[in-house]
Amino acid sequence: MEPLGNRRPCSVCITKNRNCPRFCEYAEYFPYELQSQYESANELFGTPNIITMMQHAPEEKKQMLATSIIMEGNAWTEDPISGGFGMIQKLMWKIMLHKAYLRELQEKIKEEKEKKPASSLY
């Protein structure tokens, strides 16, 4: 982690309205640049719960956890009814539509190949 002199306070310290220590353990995961996204996660989970989750996570999983917390907060901001599940449903629907479109294109290609005589293919 970098010294505070070279960075702004992290999102966790801003939310808790405290001075960000020189080597804050949350600065790496929730930097100042993610403040607006962190606010969404804070509304969903609350900073005390986020801190508890981060403290209990193994070191190698903390970055993944922080990313998941931010993404889940964003999902609920975007879709307050369904959250992350709603986003997954939308993505699955898009995949189904694209697969159907791909099948349609493959059938058209097959039809065009069948229309042309074999000698014109080369």
Swiss-Prot record:
Superkingdom, natural source: Eukaryota
Domain LOB intervals: 8-109
Family listed: Belongs to the LOB domain-containing protein family.
Protein name per UniProt: LOB domain-containing protein 5
Species for this entry: Arabidopsis thaliana (Mouse-ear cress)
